[in-house]
């Protein structure tokens, strides 16, 4: 038999929906929006690093990153 702890009792309600699937699309559209925003964030960071996107007073150099 599993050991019952206070923490386990507190966390039990979070696991009550285990195995159940919401009908329809659920939160998939929200996940898609966040994935798109994360992709845009990574794209902007890559462009800044690659100097494709030049910002005033932002110098991308390993020597200046350490100071």
From Swiss-Prot:
Q: According to its UniProt record, where is this protein mainly located? A: plastid
Instruction: Give the species this sequence originates from.
Output: Porphyra purpurea
> Could you tell me the superkingdom of the organism this chain comes from?
Eukaryota
Name by which UniProt lists this protein:
Photosystem II reaction center protein H
Localization per Swiss-Prot or TrEMBL = Plastid, Chloroplast thylakoid membrane
Among Pfam families, the record links this protein to: PsbH
GO annotation terms (biological process): photosynthesis; protein stabilization
Is Nucleotide-binding among this UniProt entry's keywords? Answer: no
The record lists the membrane-crossing segments as 29-49
Q: Which GO terms describe its cellular component?
A: chloroplast thylakoid membrane; photosystem II
Question: Which keywords are on file for this protein?
Answer: Chloroplast, Membrane, Photosynthesis, Photosystem II, Plastid, Thylakoid, Transmembrane, Transmembrane helix
Q: How does it assemble?
A: PSII is composed of 1 copy each of membrane proteins PsbA, PsbB, PsbC, PsbD, PsbE, PsbF, PsbH, PsbI, PsbJ, PsbK, PsbL, PsbM, PsbT, PsbX, PsbY, PsbZ, Psb30/Ycf12, at least 3 peripheral proteins of the oxygen-evolving complex and a large number of cofactors. It forms dimeric complexes.
Annotated family: Belongs to the PsbH family.
Query: What the protein does?
Result: One of the components of the core complex of photosystem II (PSII), required for its stability and/or assembly. PSII is a light-driven water:plastoquinone oxidoreductase that uses light energy to abstract electrons from H(2)O, generating O(2) and a proton gradient subsequently used for ATP formation. It consists of a core antenna complex that captures photons, and an electron transfer chain that converts photonic excitation into a charge separation.
- Gene3D superfamilies, per this entry? Photosystem II reaction center protein H
Output the lineage of the source organism.
Eukaryota, Rhodophyta, Bangiophyceae, Bangiales, Bangiaceae
Q: How does it sit in the membrane?
A: Single-pass membrane protein
């Amino acid at each position: 038999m599993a050991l019952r702890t206070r923490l386990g009792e507190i966390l039990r309600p979070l696991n009550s929906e285990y195995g159940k699937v919401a009908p329809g699309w659920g939160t998939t559209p929200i996940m898609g929006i966040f994935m798109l925003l994360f992709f845009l964030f990574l794209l902007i960071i890559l462009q800044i690093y690659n100097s494709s996107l030049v910002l005033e007073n932002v110098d991308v150099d390993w020597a200046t990153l350490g100071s």
